[in-house]
Amino acid sequence: MNFIYNLLLFKVSILLRFIALFNKKIKLFVDGRKQTFNKLNSIQKTDKVIWFHAASLGEFEQGRPIIEALKERYKNHKIVVTFFSPSGYEIRKNYNLADVVCYLPFDTKSNVKKFIDKIHPEIAIIIKYEFWPNLLSEVRKQGINTILISGIFRKKQSFFKWHGGFMRDKLNAFNHFYLQNKESKKLLSTIGFENITIAGDTRFDRVLDILKQDNSLDFINEFKNDTYTLVAGSTWKEDEKLLVNYINNHALADEKFIIAPHNINQKQIKELQESINKKTILYSEKEGQNLSENQVFIIDTIGLLTKIYSYADVAYVGGGLATGLHNILEPATFGVPIVFGANKYKKFQEATDLLKLGGVKTVVNEQEFTTIFTSLKNKKEFRTKLGSINQKYISENTGATKTIMDYIKKTL
């Protein structure tokens, strides 16, 4: 099986280099990896290294509370953060708490051996998933203390299939599994793993910390002007279709809208703006304008959404009607009632939990969207009830960072 995997890997690497000629994201994926070993030249043989690996931005945010806690406690250690995806690397490549941020090398035997030899980590921390066979074989071979944090396992994964022996064996590289839920523990137990702790999701610690920071934005204060405001975050075209229908046909003068699209491509932003029949302004055009005169504010930049959620009376979180639901924990920590699309949310534990608790609502079409947001606008006590459920859920699920740190302190 190792031979077949490595042969497929070789063929995929050639294919990716070809696709990179025509695809910008794949080009970043391929070209970025050419810089990995140069970036690692700053790591010396005498350095003590802690290595984190995240697939993309969401997984990085799960690891961030641990990175911050380790940086505070182990000031003389160097921290290396690797990403698989350009969407994570491009946004966090200048993360100031890491000594090196780079792409994870392509999973060939020679690459991973060179990589592990170069960084010689005291501990390897894999976030949520990313089970690369050659990489896991190498850390196991070198006896590196390796842990999985915020892990989730599902029945459909190959580990739990009759033909999954190859991947099951790779899990032996982990010294400990820190999982999000009981279901994942049960699954791992069925294939013989007992080195498991249900720690929960470190993102809860991260979002709770958000409440301690200054979340004020002067331009949002000016725009909102104490008016009822719906914040729609990380929206896709499928979400925006429902949102625009509501704004154009049902919104009254006493409600405002802030839209932060997932894709801030200039052409798509302009199309969104032109589809709205209410007075609308873009973030990129806000200077010198009277923001309070506008009813819709489109945020055509990144990095502001978390703070903007603090201004929401209600929130719509995008992705649930498209490729997958985005982060609902951020609006939840502010005690905001949340609505999202009903098609692609079930793999997100927090979404299924909050749906059962009643803190969130789902929609699939324009009629449902209009009905739920009209009800939320007209019933303040309804909004308060949902928001309280969400905020309580966040506070009751913190503590994963401390649990994981207690283990790391014993091993470093």
Regions flagged by a language model, labelled:
Residues 1-412:
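Nucleotide-activated sugar donor-binding and catalytic core shared by glycosyltransferases
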